[in-house]
From Swiss-Prot:
Belongs to the class-I pyridoxal-phosphate-dependent aminotransferase family. Substrate binds at E61, Y100. Optimum pH is 8. This is 1-aminocyclopropane-1-carboxylate synthase 7. Its EC number is 4.4.1.14. GO terms for molecular function: 1-aminocyclopropane-1-carboxylate synthase activity; identical protein binding; pyridoxal phosphate binding. The keyword Ubl conjugation applies. Keywords: Ethylene biosynthesis, Fruit ripening, Lyase, Pyridoxal phosphate, S-adenosyl-L-methionine, Ubl conjugation. Transmembrane segments: none annotated. The gene is ACS7. Expressed in roots. Induction: By cycloheximide (CHX). One of its GO terms (biological process) is ethylene biosynthetic process. InterPro entries: Aminotransferase_I/II_large, Ethylene_sulfur-biosynth, NHTrfase_class1_PyrdxlP-BS, PyrdxlP-dep_Trfase, PyrdxlP-dep_Trfase_major, PyrdxlP-dep_Trfase_small.
Length: 447
């Protein structure tokens, strides 16, 4: 069935029609989150050529361990590994059609890597892995499978601004926020869950699931095991799904501080409970490979796996990419070294920015994971409102030339919080960013 058509607003009545999806404003790209990216693109910082330019601190990209990947590829001769087998047979193997849901060798390697990240505390069946072109595609595909247009997913705030696009735009599904606050470090409570569910019911919106990020983006903190258990109990009582986006699971500074929902499921025998749980993963954050566009859906539900395989034809990963990464992820000596060093480098980088901000008189939420910190500038707001927050964000963007993400773009229930990324730049660039913040705070104190 085709999409219903409507006229695009224009003074020209003869304009050709576009679909409702095309002219919808649910793409989310009018958010300050994306406006900051545009400001960076127009005036990017460069240490030599544009030292006064905008420093991009709104992009959660992991560049701190790229040297490890480059060294591995140089030593392992990627020409052979990326083609599977060498020469003409390898080329033929890549050039012809493959299983839409992913090459078996790569799914096996991905399953092993996901187990390794979790310290062997959860097992993953390669036959339950469906490959997608990144986590963005995985989350959207799952939303298509779990919900109908005008249904809703409950999502705890603050949440990743891109979810407004990924979960809503093409699917027609709504996001109903689970409002969390700083009184308990923004952890999800049973009361907040029930309140969000009731809000949806009062609006005659059918709730189809809860979607969380663990570790949280933008908080940079893991979800506690008890909270995960409460979430699953809630989903069972309401007969809805639980989606856990775990794309930062390998970026927890200390592995023991992370509990995957897979560990909870591991100890459950009841199939009717297990089959409502779905995990999203990607190599974009932990391995720092967003350009490779590799994401996965892992579901304990046979029907979801079956449908995701069918839908994955719209979001394939190239065979060449799969062959190369299968070779890399199957090298356990390399992956163990990479995970260990990457965790330590991220922890040191986090400590650098948090201590630097503290010296400037700025506090952050205590974090233990991810590529960002959650910074509290509420004390600088002239007005304790969303407009007041955006005014401060505008000053930071235009006067300090720093692009950070305001909490309102993450639907935070409290004003004055900002997400600040630290892993997509050199240590020297981070020091320059901190210097700009220190100078800004000094000026504020004088006036």
């Amino acid at each position: 069935m085709g999409l219903p058509l409507m006229m695009e607003r224009s003074s020209n009545n003869n304009n050709v029609e576009l679909s409702r999806v095309a002219v919808s404003d649910t793409h989310g790209e009018d958010s300050p989150y994306f406006a900051g990216w545009k400001a960076y693109d127009e005036n990017p910082y460069d240490e030599s050529h544009n030292p006064s330019g905008v420093i991009q601190m709104g992009l959660a990209e992991n560049q701190v361990s790229f040297d490890l990947l480059e060294t591995y590829l140089e030593k392992k001769n990627p020409e052979g590994s990326m083609w599977g087998s060498k020469g003409a047979p390898g080329f033929r193997e890549n050039a012809l059609f493959q299983d839409y849901h992913g090459l078996k060798t790569f799914r096996q390697a991905m399953a092993s890597f996901m187990e390794q990240i979790r310290g062997g505390k959860a097992r993953f069946d390669p036959d339950r892995i469906v490959l997608t072109a990144g986590a963005t595609a995985a989350n959207e595909l799952l939303t298509f499978i779990l919900a109908d247009p005008n249904d809703a997913l409950l999502v705890p705030t603050p949440y990743y601004p891109g979810f407004d696009r990924d979960l809503r735009w093409r699917t027609g599904v709504k996001i109903v926020p689970i409002h969390c606050d700083s009184s308990n470090h923004f952890q999800i409570t049973p009361e907040a869950l029930e309140s969000a569910y009731q809000t949806a019911r009062d609006a005659n919106i059918r709730v189809r699931g809860v979607l969380i990020t663990n570790p949280s983006n933008p908080l940079g903190a893991t979800v506690q095991k008890k909270v995960l258990e409460d979430l699953l109990d809630f989903c069972v009582r309401k007969n809805i799904h639980l989606v856990s986006d775990e794309i930062y699971s390998g970026s927890v500074f200390h592995a023991s501080e992370f509990t995957s929902v897979a560990e909870i499921v591991e100890n459950i025998d009841d199939v009717s409970v297990k089959e409502r749980v779905h995990i999203v993963y990607s190599l974009s954050k932990d391995l720092g490979l967003p350009g490779f566009r590799v994401g996965t859906i892992y579901s304990y539900n046979d029907n979801v796996v079956r449908t995701a395989r069918r839908m994955s034809s719209f979001t394939l990963v190239s065979s060449q990419t799969q062959h190369m990464l299968a070779s890399m992820l199957s090298d356990e000596e390399f992956t163990e070294k990479y995970i260990r060093i990457n965790r330590e480098r991220l922890r040191r980088r986090y400590d650098t920015i948090v201590e630097g901000l503290k010296k400037a008189g700025i506090e952050c939420l205590k974090g233990n994971a991810g590529l960002f910190c959650w910074m509290n500038l509420g004390f600088l707001l002239e007005k304790k409102t969303k407009d007041g927050e955006l005014q401060l964000w505008d000053v930071i963007l235009k006067e300090l030339n720093l692009n950070i993400s305001p909490g309102s773009s993450c639907h935070c229930s409290e004003v004055g919080w900002f997400r600040v990324c630290f892993a997509n730049m050199s240590e020297n660039t981070l020091e320059i960013a901190l210097k700009r913040i220190h100078e800004f705070m000094d000026r504020r104190r004088r006036f």
